[in-house]
Amino acid sequence: MNGCLQVASGGHKGPLRKLFKKVDGKMQMIDLNDEPFPETDTFVEVKKGSLVLLHGRLPHYSCENTSLKSRHAYTIHVIDNNNDYPEWNWLQRSSLPLKSFIND
């Protein structure tokens, strides 16, 4: 069985509840808010070859893929060049520096 993508409708409007942070070279999930996540109430069937865009704060979930067919997912994180991006962020890696789409 290939689990269906589920999202919490309107969940992106709530507070940031958790974030990933590098601590001593290891990734940890940090709790920021005790407010429970909203229920994932919307099933999003995604056909092969589709593109799905999710807001960074949208709670989403997918059950484990137990089928014999792989379910590939590629993630692109877009960050405004004018924002301060903390060194402790889990995406910041000296071995793989972030690249800009714009030549300054």
Question: Across the structure, where does each feature detected by a protein language model lie?
Answer:
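Non-heme Fe(II)/2-oxoglutarate
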Residues: F20, L51-L53, R57-D104
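Double-stranded beta-helix
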Residues: M1-L58
